[in-house]
Amino acid sequence: MRLLAVTALLLLSFAAPAHASSGCTVYNGACVQKHTNQAWLVTNGVTSYGPVRISHGKPGFGTPVGNFPVLRKVKNDWSVPYNGPMPNAVYFTTDGIAFHQGDLNSQTHGCVRLSWNDSEVFYNNLFPGERVQVLP
């Protein structure tokens, strides 16, 4: 039993922190790094998915930098202000900023766009109350 406990501690000590060089401090949730156009999921302080390519807010509609809670999820949402689909939306600000599927080759009105497959993974693995950290 003692050997099992020691082995488990050794394995945990070698687990890579969630992109430590990025400055992301999320323990459970997601990190976004705008200057590299990447995002990743974090579980128990370790990167569990990604990094993946993203698109984020264009000038005048910047994706806000900071720490936010996941607020809600909507499988097939529609943006009324921008008249467009928001599949796999995971909202993390009260003014409508979310992760969702969309074109990665153009900038957004503040949301974080993901590929179809990545948006499904983020949708299925982020939950209300978990954290999203957006880095410059």
Q: How would you label these PLM feature ranges?
A:
Residues 21-27, 58-67, 72-136:
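Exported/periplasmic cell-wall-interacting domains
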Residues 21-58:
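A structural motif detector for short, solvent-exposed N-terminal "entry" segments of globular domains
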Residues 1-20:
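Secretory targeting and sorting signals
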